[in-house]
């Protein structure tokens, strides 16, 4: 496709010694075919390599292509054993974005419900569950007048649906995603989905969080595993069917949780392994 052509043209013009590919098994294969002398580092999720909930043949396909890399860096909430198909293999904690590394959280009465995770090219079930989380937070805000409930929408259509609802005065609707460092710095509580990157950032910063497990059955299993693997007191799971009263009680409880030991990011280990390649 056009993007593939563009990438290969950039490689020919720039002639790099090393290329880092975030997943994308077919791109790894294509680069190794067309540019065999260039070293390739694959950044992977633990579930990309070991996932008993996925089809075995699909996992064999993905691992066959991922293992063409000169170095596979598997970063996430859990560590996994080396797969013998890989040349060089490193399993580390999640690599944290540079803009998050320097954030210092000073808790306030601000609660942030971050409706991220993408709303483009996703199923209706995902959109519906996203709206349901936002609507729940709108209802809960009236039960928690001492807090300000920020609801951060990842798209205009989600914002439009929520904006039609009546909300208490302590609700602030954001019609687009705001920089994470902007709300991480003063959040007393974050309400989010159970994705690897967001949970890892919250664990690194020590911010209390309520994480919703939602979406298709495959995603629910993956998100539940993320919570279980993390296993820290500052982050708990919730389901979409929780009542507003129970959710308000949970919010108040989590606002009182003390910070634990931060989860160390895998950034330094990843950089060292690449430099030694």
Predicted regions and their residues:
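Short beta-strand segments
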Residues: 149-153
């Amino acid at each position: 496709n056009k993007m593939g052509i563009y990438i290969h043209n950039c490689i020919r013009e720039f002639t790099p010694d090393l290329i880092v590919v975030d997943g994308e098994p077919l791109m790894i294969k294509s680069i190794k075919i067309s540019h065999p002398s260039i070293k390739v580092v694959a950044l992977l999720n633990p579930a990309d390599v070991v996932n008993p909930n996925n089809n075995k043949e699909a996992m064999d396909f993905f691992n066959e292509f991922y293992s063409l890399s000169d170095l596979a860096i598997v970063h996430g909430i859990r560590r996994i054993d080396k797969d013998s198909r890989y040349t060089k293999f490193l399993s580390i904690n999640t690599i944290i974005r540079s803009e998050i590394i320097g954030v210092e959280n000073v808790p306030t009465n601000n609660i942030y419900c971050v409706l991220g995770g993408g709303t483009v090219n996703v199923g209706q079930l995902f959109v519906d569950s996203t709206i349901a989380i936002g609507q729940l937070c709108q209802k809960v805000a009236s039960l928690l007048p001492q807090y300000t409930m920020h609801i951060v929408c990842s798209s205009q259509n989600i914002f439009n649906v929520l904006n039609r609802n009546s909300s208490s005065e302590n609700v602030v609707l954001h019609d687009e995603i705001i920089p994470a460092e902007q709300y991480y710095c003063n959040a007393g509580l974050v309400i989010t989905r159970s994705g690897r990157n967001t949970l890892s950032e919250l664990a690194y910063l020590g911010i209390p969080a309520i994480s919703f497990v939602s979406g298709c059955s495959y995603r629910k299993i993956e998100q539940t595993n993320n919570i279980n693997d993390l296993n820290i007191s500052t982050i708990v799971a919730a389901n979409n069917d929780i009542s507003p009263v129970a959710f308000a009680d949970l919010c108040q409880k989590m606002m009182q949780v003390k910070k634990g030991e931060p989860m160390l990011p895998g950034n330094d280990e990843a950089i060292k392994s690449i430099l030694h390649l």
